Protein backbone atom coordinates (compact mmCIF):
# COMPACT_ATOMS: atom_id res chain seq x y z
CA UNK A 1 0.00 0.00 0.00
CA UNK A 2 1.27 3.45 -0.89
CA UNK A 3 2.28 5.94 1.78
CA UNK A 4 -0.21 8.78 2.11
CA UNK A 5 1.20 12.19 2.87
CA UNK A 6 -1.02 15.12 3.79
CA UNK A 7 0.65 17.78 1.64
CA UNK A 8 -2.32 18.46 -0.63
CA UNK A 9 -4.85 18.41 2.20
CA UNK A 10 -2.74 20.67 4.42
CA UNK A 11 -2.17 23.13 1.58
CA UNK A 12 -5.93 23.25 0.91
CA UNK A 13 -6.70 23.83 4.58
CA UNK A 14 -4.04 26.51 4.93
CA UNK A 15 -5.27 28.30 1.82
CA UNK A 16 -8.84 28.19 3.12
CA UNK A 17 -7.83 29.77 6.45
CA UNK A 18 -5.60 32.39 4.81
CA UNK A 19 -8.44 33.30 2.46
CA UNK A 20 -10.71 33.88 5.48
CA UNK A 21 -7.94 35.96 7.09
CA UNK A 22 -7.78 38.34 4.14
CA UNK A 23 -7.90 41.91 5.40
CA UNK A 24 -6.32 41.11 8.75
CA UNK A 25 -3.12 43.03 9.55
CA UNK A 26 0.43 41.71 9.69
CA UNK A 27 1.14 38.08 10.49
CA UNK A 28 -2.56 37.48 11.10
CA UNK A 29 -3.09 37.42 7.35
CA UNK A 30 0.27 35.97 6.21
CA UNK A 31 1.20 33.14 8.58
CA UNK A 32 -1.00 30.12 9.12
CA UNK A 33 -0.93 29.77 12.91
CA UNK A 34 -1.78 33.35 13.87
CA UNK A 35 -4.23 33.51 10.98
CA UNK A 36 -5.94 30.33 12.15
CA UNK A 37 -6.25 31.62 15.72
CA UNK A 38 -7.71 34.95 14.69
CA UNK A 39 -10.03 33.43 12.09
CA UNK A 40 -11.47 31.17 14.80
CA UNK A 41 -11.83 34.15 17.13
CA UNK A 42 -13.42 36.23 14.35
CA UNK A 43 -15.92 33.46 13.62
CA UNK A 44 -16.83 33.32 17.33
CA UNK A 45 -17.34 37.08 17.36
CA UNK A 46 -19.45 36.85 14.21
CA UNK A 47 -21.64 34.18 15.82
CA UNK A 48 -22.17 36.30 18.94
CA UNK A 49 -22.78 39.37 16.78
CA UNK A 50 -25.59 37.65 14.92
CA UNK A 51 -27.32 36.99 18.24
CA UNK A 52 -26.72 40.55 19.50
CA UNK A 53 -28.06 42.06 16.28
CA UNK A 54 -31.50 40.62 16.99
CA UNK A 55 -31.52 42.20 20.48
CA UNK A 56 -30.24 45.53 19.18
CA UNK A 57 -32.89 45.79 16.48
CA UNK A 58 -35.68 44.87 18.88
CA UNK A 59 -34.43 47.58 21.27
CA UNK A 60 -34.32 50.10 18.41
CA UNK A 61 -37.88 49.25 17.31
CA UNK A 62 -39.19 49.59 20.87
CA UNK A 63 -37.44 52.95 21.28
CA UNK A 64 -38.98 54.25 18.05
CA UNK A 65 -42.46 53.01 18.98
CA UNK A 66 -42.13 54.54 22.45
CA UNK A 67 -41.17 57.93 21.00
CA UNK A 68 -44.07 57.86 18.54
CA UNK A 69 -46.64 56.76 21.13
CA UNK A 70 -45.54 59.48 23.56
CA UNK A 71 -46.09 62.07 20.81
CA UNK A 72 -49.64 60.70 20.60
CA UNK A 73 -50.11 60.83 24.37
CA UNK A 74 -49.57 57.24 25.47
CA UNK A 75 -46.67 55.25 26.91
CA UNK A 76 -45.18 52.25 25.11
CA UNK A 77 -46.34 49.67 27.64
CA UNK A 78 -49.92 50.99 27.66
CA UNK A 79 -49.91 51.10 23.85
CA UNK A 80 -48.82 47.46 23.57
CA UNK A 81 -51.36 46.46 26.22
CA UNK A 82 -54.13 48.31 24.35
CA UNK A 83 -53.17 46.63 21.08
CA UNK A 84 -53.34 43.21 22.73
CA UNK A 85 -56.78 44.01 24.20
CA UNK A 86 -58.07 45.15 20.80
CA UNK A 87 -56.79 41.98 19.15
CA UNK A 88 -54.31 43.72 16.84
CA UNK A 89 -51.29 41.47 16.33
CA UNK A 90 -48.55 43.49 14.66
CA UNK A 91 -44.90 42.89 15.39
CA UNK A 92 -42.62 45.63 16.65
CA UNK A 93 -40.73 45.89 13.38
CA UNK A 94 -43.88 46.76 11.45
CA UNK A 95 -45.08 49.12 14.18
CA UNK A 96 -41.72 50.89 14.09
CA UNK A 97 -41.88 51.30 10.30
CA UNK A 98 -45.44 52.63 10.61
CA UNK A 99 -44.36 55.11 13.26
CA UNK A 100 -41.75 56.52 10.86
CA UNK A 101 -43.43 56.32 7.45
CA UNK A 102 -47.19 56.30 8.13
CA UNK A 103 -47.79 58.69 11.02
CA UNK A 104 -51.57 58.95 10.43
CA UNK A 105 -52.04 55.17 10.41
CA UNK A 106 -49.94 54.87 13.55
CA UNK A 107 -51.99 57.61 15.24
CA UNK A 108 -55.14 55.59 14.46
CA UNK A 109 -53.57 52.53 16.10
CA UNK A 110 -52.76 54.62 19.18
CA UNK A 111 -56.37 55.86 19.30
CA UNK A 112 -57.66 52.29 19.03
CA UNK A 113 -55.37 51.25 21.89
CA UNK A 114 -56.54 54.22 24.00
CA UNK A 115 -60.21 53.32 23.45
CA UNK A 116 -59.63 49.70 24.48
CA UNK A 117 -57.72 50.78 27.58
CA UNK A 118 -60.52 53.16 28.64
CA UNK A 119 -63.32 50.68 27.89
Curated annotation (Swiss-Prot):
Per the record, the gene is rplT
| Species whose genome carries this gene | Alkaliphilus metalliredigens (strain QYMF)
CDD domains cross-referenced by the UniProt entry: Ribosomal_L20
- The organism's superkingdom is given as Bacteria
Select a single GO molecular function from the record's annotations and give it: structural constituent of ribosome
Stated name of the protein: Large ribosomal subunit protein bL20
- CC annotations in GO: ribonucleoprotein complex; ribosome
Q: What PROSITE patterns does the record tag this protein with?
A: RIBOSOMAL_L20
Kindly give the PANTHER family that the UniProt entry links to this protein. Answer: 39S RIBOSOMAL PROTEIN L20 (PTHR10986)
Q: Which InterPro entries match?
A: Ribosomal_bL20 (IPR005813), RIBOSOMAL_L20_CS (IPR049946), Ribosomal_protein_bL20_C (IPR035566)
